[in-house]
């Protein structure tokens, strides 16, 4: 079954920045935005996996503060910002590593903050903009994933705070929080101590489903949705 519901051209004339565009959910989002007519600037340290006249690849290490600040300033013209870059790490108490926690924080929280700090004020000055952070259902907490969950919970706090700042100026900011999604991250050895859980739906979330939801939040039809944590979890967040 196709997850596509938006009409062709729904994002024509939209200039979007998508971090993590070379793989996984970020790739699916960038690909869908291109199909809907957007101009996409893909930010990733990995080689680009998309092409075409409306796709612009920017090789940036999101763990490099100076590089992120520089590219954020260069992309201040953007109408939409999607921060989809992310990694998974899992470990129980007694096996937590400070370096892992710092890496997760820099990628999920600090990089998002640096990008938004340069791009969102410019959006607000123009009176229009859309921001989506790709979070996780795990933000509510899960055994063995405390460091990862903490950074995803921080994303929700960022979004709610930022949304309150810029709502009167035509900018919406939301989190989309998937449950386990069918990407290569499911097989990441860094999550070996905390295996993915199949949601009640009976299958993992498809990257295209996440991409379609993100794309909708970038459209004019989503103008009244801001400061929200929108879960796409196949029932995983429901009471057992």
List each language-model region with its residue ranges.
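Short C-terminal tail/terminal secondary-structure segment
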Residues: 2-7, 226-240
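Conserved glycine-rich cofactor-binding loop
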Residues: 22-23
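Catalytic Tyr-X3-Lys loop
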Residues: 87, 94-114, 132, 155
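Conserved mid-core segment of classical short-chain dehydrogenase/reductases
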Residues: 88-102, 144-147, 185-189
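Alpha-helical segment proximal to the catalytic Tyr-Lys
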Residues: 121, 164-165, 223
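Catalytic loop of short-chain dehydrogenase/reductase
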Residues: 130-154, 159-168, 180
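Short, small/polar-rich loop/turn modules that mediate ligand/substrate recognition or access, typified
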Residues: 167, 172, 225-227
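A conserved structural motif in NAD(P)-dependent oxidoreductases
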Residues: 199-210
């Amino acid at each position: 079954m196709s997850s596509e519901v938006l009409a062709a051209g729904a994002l024509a004339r939209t200039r979007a920045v998508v971090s993590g565009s070379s793989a996984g959910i970020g790739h699916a989002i960038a690909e869908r935005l291109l199909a809907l007519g957007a101009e996409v600037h893909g930010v990733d340290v990995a080689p680009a996996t998309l092409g075409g006249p409306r796709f612009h690849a920017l090789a940036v290490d999101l763990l490099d503060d100076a590089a992120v600040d520089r590219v954020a300033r260069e992309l201040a013209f953007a109408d939409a910002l999607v921060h989809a870059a992310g990694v998974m790490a899992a470990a129980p108490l007694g096996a937590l590593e400070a370096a892992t926690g710092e890496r997760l924080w820099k990628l999920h929280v600090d990089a998002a903050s640096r990008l938004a700090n340069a791009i969102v004020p410019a959006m607000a000055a123009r009176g229009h903009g859309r921001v989506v952070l790709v979070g996780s259902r795990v933000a509510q907490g899960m055994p063995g994933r405390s460091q990862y969950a903490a950074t995803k919970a921080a994303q929700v706090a960022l979004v709610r705070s930022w949304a309150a700042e810029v709502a009167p100026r035509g900018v919406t900011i939301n989190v989309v929080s998937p449950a386990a999604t069918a990407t290569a991250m499911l097989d990441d050895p860094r999550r070996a101590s905390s295996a993915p859980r199949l949601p009640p739906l009976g299958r993992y979330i498809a990257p295209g489903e996440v991409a379609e939801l993100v794309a909708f939040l970038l459209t004019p039809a989503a103008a009244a949705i801001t400061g929200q944590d929108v879960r796409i979890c196949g029932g995983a967040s429901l009471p057992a």
